[in-house]
């Protein structure tokens, strides 16, 4: 599968309702929260509750989570992309854009709860900023990665695994605010990806950083990723709560 470093032409974004809030109010610093190892359902419910309760004064947050094994299917997703019905991994239908993906131990999941109007961000611009943050994060570990036209996410740029997917992206926009986000594969059991057509693409190879011979620590990668996300959202001088609690994560 050949990959070219081009801008995406479609994005897995679900949009509902009309934007609300004040677009002229400056965006406060992003608060970063490490929520620990948490079931997908708990994170999903918390994201929706947070977004529903937002006011014009609610700060933006990035949540870093590691999930037990779970498949998630986007709101317009095709269930036939789950190839093994009795895999033992639960399937959760969700309201983000995109098709089916897998979350599990050894993967960083970052949820971006942002007021897009306040940040004066169009959805496509947000997607680009997220993708750039992942590309920059991987580059910090000497891994070259690219976007792929028509297939949102981040892909290996060259080598034996050229074209393999290493990060997935899916968002929901409600009342002008985003939730859901991205997942980056650090050191995982990749076998559950074989039971699906990842993001709806049959035969798409999925890799992690370990597959690319990078012995990266989950915490280090998470710190790098969140720094790049915040820098891309607010500029390199943006203030944010340092996610000290990430140090509690165990790679065992």
Curated annotation (Swiss-Prot):
Pfam families from the UniProt entry: LplA-B_cat
Keyword field contains ATP-binding: no
PROSITE patterns in the cross-refs: BPL_LPL_CATALYTIC, LIPB
Catalyzed reactions: octanoyl-[ACP] + L-lysyl-[protein] = N(6)-octanoyl-L-lysyl-[protein] + holo-[ACP] + H(+)
CDD domains, A to Z: LipB
Free-text function comment from the UniProt entry: Catalyzes the transfer of endogenously produced octanoic acid from octanoyl-acyl-carrier-protein onto the lipoyl domains of lipoate-dependent enzymes. Lipoyl-ACP can also act as a substrate although octanoyl-ACP is likely to be the physiological substrate.
Protein known as: Octanoyltransferase
InterPro entries in UniProt: aa-tRNA-synth_II/BPL/LPL, BPL_LPL_catalytic, Octanoyltransferase, Octanoyltransferase_CS
Gene behind this protein: lipB
Note: In the reaction, the free carboxyl group of octanoic acid is attached via an amide linkage to the epsilon-amino group of a specific lysine residue of lipoyl domains of lipoate-dependent enzymes.
Recorded metabolic or biological pathway in which this protein acts: Protein modification; protein lipoylation via endogenous pathway; protein N(6)-(lipoyl)lysine from octanoyl-[acyl-carrier-protein]: step 1/2
Keyword terms: Acyltransferase, Cytoplasm, Transferase
One Gene Ontology term of the molecular function aspect: lipoyl(octanoyl) transferase activity
Annotated compartments: Cytoplasm
Annotated family: Belongs to the LipB family.
Domain BPL/LPL catalytic, residue spans: 56-237
């Amino acid at each position: 599968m050949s990959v070219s470093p081009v801008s995406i032409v479609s994005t897995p974004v679900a949009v509902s309702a009309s934007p609300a809030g004040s677009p002229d109010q400056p965006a406060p610093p992003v608060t970063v929260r490490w929520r620990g190892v948490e079931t997908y359902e708990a994170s999903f419910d918390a994201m929706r509750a947070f977004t529903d309760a937002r006011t014009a004064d609610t700060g933006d947050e990035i949540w870093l989570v590691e999930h037990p094994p779970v498949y998630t299917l986007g709101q317009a997703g095709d269930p036939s992309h789950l190839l093994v019905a009795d895999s033992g991994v639960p399937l959760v239908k969700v309201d983000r854009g995109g098709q089916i993906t897998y979350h599990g131990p050894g993967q960083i999941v970052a949820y971006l709860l942002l007021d897009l109007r306040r940040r004066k961000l169009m959805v496509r611009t947000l997607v680009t900023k997220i993708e750039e943050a992942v590309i920059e994060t991987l580059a910090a570990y000497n891994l070259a990665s690219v976007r792929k036209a028509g297939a949102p996410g981040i892909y290996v740029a060259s080598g034996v695994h050229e074209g393999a997917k290493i990060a997935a992206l899916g968002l929901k926009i409600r009342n002008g605010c985003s939730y859901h986000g991205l997942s980056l594969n650090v050191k995982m059991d990749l076998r559950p990806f074989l039971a699906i057509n990842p993001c709806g693409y049959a035969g798409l190879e999925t890799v992690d950083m370990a597959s690319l011979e990078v012995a990266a620590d989950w915490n280090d990668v998470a710190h790098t990723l969140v720094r790049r996300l915040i820098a891309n959202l607010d500029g390199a001088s943006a203030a944010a709560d340092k996610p000290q609690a990430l140090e509690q994560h165990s790679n065992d």
